[in-house]
Amino acid sequence: MKILYVTKALIAPPYAGCMQRTVHIARQLKPCGQVTMLAINRRFDSDSVNVCRQEFSRFDQILLRSYTDFPKRRGELLRKFHMHWPTLCGIRADRQGQALFETLAAQHDVIWFHTLGAAQPFSLPRTTPMVMDLDDLNHCKYEQSARIQTTLRFRLSAHVQSYKWKRLEREALKRYAAVVVCSEQDKQLLGGDDKIFVVPNGFTLPAEKPTCGPPDPLRLGFISHLAYGPNRDGLIWFRDRIWPLIRREKPNMCLRIVGRIPSDNDLIRAEGFEYLGYIDDPTEEIQRWSAMIVPIPYGGGTRIKILDAFSKCCPVVATSIGAYGIQGEHGRHFLLADEPQKFADYCLMLSSQPERGCQLADEAWALFCEKYTWDKIGRSIIAAAETVAKTPSTDVTGKP
């Protein structure tokens, strides 16, 4: 089988969850046969290109125009239009890019798109079976965002965006031979159709189980790419509503923040917040945390940061949305709180009772090994690809 894997999220370094999902799904597809990666974006970094060329037998790129390539006023109008009208979500490939895509599509048995944004720039073929990995359900993200907006304008905008994305996501069920989502909950939100495959996010299984503790009782941690809205808004909520409650009880508590920081303007500042930047292997750092916090107020898919904590035997305190899609139990695998005082209490408890944190971490490790290693998830990925490869070409609509 020959699989064309199309993505806008490259993989070096994998500082965002979508990048980790991209590389691991593409790797898990290799047992099916030859995998060609087609990357589309407005810019490429040399590290990502070099890694992809080493990872895959064939790697191609299509460079899309950027909004800044247009005259200033037109570029701004296009950006706003594409943001508010996801049906036309972005800039189309030029003739050369479309021709390359058509050539590759004709040479492969299955096309696997990572998100609707990877398919949008092209006119799609009518004869090659296609898989759409929705990753996040954007309609859920906007629906949840509407609940926390403080102005009528932003609430209405979020509701409208949610409606538009819901239509697009449901239309994907008609346009693609299979649709992939991150959780059983997401599958049911789309109607539970047999052509929907659940491929959860995962994490790499360490060579051996990490040691749990002893943590630093005055150290909490957060893994975040702050350019991503749910991460940024979640950290602001934590800073404003929860951090003062924690520091009132333990004035020397610090929050260690790991993740790429696009610019100083993206820093969310507070006394005790320590930014470490991107760390290629944060295992030793995470093992010193008394807990990893996941104060996410809205979003879709599943939180790779929680699975990262599970794989490193670090206890987790999260909001219910922060733990969405993960088949864990409150009080057994993690602690969940949507109310600021309760969230703060859980953080303080784990700081003072490391043995309780180790109990949570041990149960979370067992759950991770059972359900969330990429070796286990790979079975669902291969099943989706093999099922789609058998789809008669007449079942593929090819609508753009």
Residue ranges: model-predicted function:
Residues 165, 198-288:
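Conserved catalytic-core segment of nucleotide-activated headgroup transferases in glycan assembly
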Residues 1-61, 106:
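N-terminal subdomain of nucleotide-sugar transferases
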Residues 177, 287-301, 312-315:
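Acidic donor-binding loop of glycosyltransferase active sites
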Residues 349, 356-371, 380:
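A short, well-ordered alpha-helix in the C-terminal region of glycosyltransferases
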Residues 305-308, 315-319:
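Short hydrophobic beta-strand element within catalytic cores of glycosyltransferases
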Residues 334-341, 349-354:
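Conserved acidic donor-binding segment of nucleotide-sugar-dependent glycosyltransferases
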Residues 8, 66-89, 130-170, 225, ...:
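Acceptor-binding helix/loop patch of EC 2.4 sugar-transfer enzymes
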Residues 131-132, 139, 159-166, 170-208:
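Donor nucleotide-sugar binding/catalytic pocket of nucleotide-sugar-dependent glycosyltransferases
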